[in-house]
């Protein structure tokens, strides 16, 4: 099966590899390499050609060639160099282009390659990067430029683009700007001063090399007129503060009366400016436009704020655009009325001078176009204010008086004949009705103002004596869209809440009114935590699945109100009401925008227990949020011990999931008490090893004294102990156990990939893979018939401070004593005994070899399954990203709802797949451990066969030497050669003695090997069968669990679409 990633597929699934390519890949399989693979995307149109040279440029050797504090250098498989710096990879020596890409993901990949030995399953560290290292950047498509709209760079940018020009002009222009001081006696002279300054700047530009000026015009696609315009803008921006201050000083007499008039009509309302249509939908736009225009109010006093034409024009244009968006057609009369209220509420000074400044010093067309229309309209507004000042002041004063008393709660003795009510406002009811229907500068009606001011007396008086109908109450909205009842709920004043609720309770469409959201998207249901009685009265009318802007439903919002004294009563009643309304509570529906379920957010143990154990509440205990954290991880992160206790009592809890950073719950738990409790809960749930009450496992890693140490928890006789061991201690344990028992089969200790190979990006997945493989190593030792009760193993597991020297000396002495004891027994194997042992061992080897080959095939299949599952998860996330892109395409509301539901479905199913992503990898590691066990047993069984062959050779040599000794002793020789014959006889006898000792040793070792292997083969078969059954059972049970969760997710998705 080819890998989904094209680079991995080319490297390990090449359809027709050359011999050189195969040799290169084989070399990678026996060395420490990492692979940089480009991230997969559906629109992958990179022009990087997949050739062996390009592919091996993405394979780096982990051993770095050099380093400093900021970056590390790594050599590629074909001799090039890349730099790792923070989360980026940069090409260096050997690459044609300077390419910088980001690291987006990392994982361990085990290829199944047909042109590699079947026994070679090398684990590669894979870094997903945002692009190819060998690609040429695709040129950007040239944009079609409309010469009429193209503005080009500013003159200040031109000075930076052409430094030679900048150096020539900067000093001259700076001198001109610094020496400028206005001496104008009137505005006409001020205009002339500005023109002279602009002309002088243009002369400076014209004085430089004409060829350079022509080059600037051609390269920046400008005309001479456009260049002069940019010089004009540059001069104005540099002198703007001086020009502005001079203009304000010259126009003080003209601005003063108008500024006073604007300040006196601050409380003018939209319903009082003769709008031809309902003014309610204009209120929010007017408040927003006033906030925009308010930025001009500080221009005169704050020297740090800009006051150039570009800033002033942009501010005024933004104000107009806020009022006249594309969806609403606004004629001139309506715009003047709206701007009148905007100017009054913004309360800015020197507005006439602002208009004059733009008309006098702007380089844009100020008498035509949108800018001219805006200035003309503002002038019309200012003229209207000047002409109708007395009437507008009277209306504003009445509004101010009325709203001040509403805010102070002083409406009990309302009198129409107040001294402040000057001419312009009559006593008839029609005039005062406009005051009662007015809005304050914040856009609030009198009712809304009374509620937000928390004035019950004002609200009571308004409702009882001022003629407000139920329709007025239902239609009343704040600028942010809050209803009167929602605003009342925010005050947490029960009297005000009851007062408003009593006025709307009997309306025809109360459910719709209760579902209206405010600026946060929250309806009445989201504020139930304020009032238990309100929940009891209208809880059945609430949409319990409605979400606010944070994705919270009324139930999830209520569950977060921990500080409420009636928290448990609120939750109990809300759950009952929600169940009555919906029939079943599915916690997947009540997730917020960050993917947090109620199990993530609720920290109260009683509420959490109710959610987990209620028969009508559907809950996925292990559902992750968008950061990949399950509820158990979230509570472990914040050390919520009581919540963890409740979750750990649930049999559905899973400790295996990892978050988006690759951290599991044991990595996340930093608090000592929390970590110890999690360890205790996890270890208590694990089954015993064999028939004993023993179990051990590596739960986390720590850095101690600059070395990676593994925290090993051991359960024995109901007690839990912990030790920290570096990887070197595992090597020590393997070495000396095998040294003491050389005839036993021994599990292999694989050399791990360094998780800190790239220090800027340590790999949690590799670290957890190390945990798993070392756990399986210890598990095999504890199930081993010989080593399970070995004192060295248990001393290593239970005692933290051990002396390697002492243990090595003790093991060596034990082995020497055993050899001495064996030498005391005189055993010589004859041919029948050797045939018997050889037959037994050969048969066992044949059977174990068949099991080894079957296990190897199963391991290969499990690796394929693991890789396919990873690709499946990747493809699922790609599909989700593609669905998310559809959101950007405008469409009808039903279509947008379908896409939103589909995207949510993708997230739900993606979380289900991702959370079970570790299951195939764990299964593959289990099978790999069984294969290593079978390999070790095969090697152990092959040893006595080799010993028997050697023994037969030694026996044949002994017969030959004995025959030679007899022949020499019977041979007659001359007296002169007598000493030579005696010397040769002594040598042969010495060789006979050595051979007899070797035969004796081989016989003893072969016999011991037979006895040892005969006693261990049963244990091997039992352990192999038990572990294989357990691994299959685990992955099957996890898959069944996953499919049950998937079925629930699919039912929820079906409910959304139907």
UniProtKB/Swiss-Prot annotation:
GO biological process: early endosome to late endosome transport
Classification via InterPro entries: Ankyrin_rpt, Ankyrin_rpt-contain_sf, PX_dom, PX_dom_sf, UPF0507/Ank_repeat_27, VPS9, VPS9_dom_sf
SMART domains the record matches: ANK
The protein, known as: UPF0507 protein YALI0E18612g
VPS9 domain sequence ranges: 252-394
Pfam families on file: PX, VPS9
Upper lineage: Eukaryota, Fungi, Dikarya, Ascomycota, Saccharomycotina
GO MF annotations, alphabetized: guanyl-nucleotide exchange factor activity; phosphatidylinositol binding; SNARE binding
A GO cellular-component term linked to this record: transport vesicle
CDD domains: PX_domain
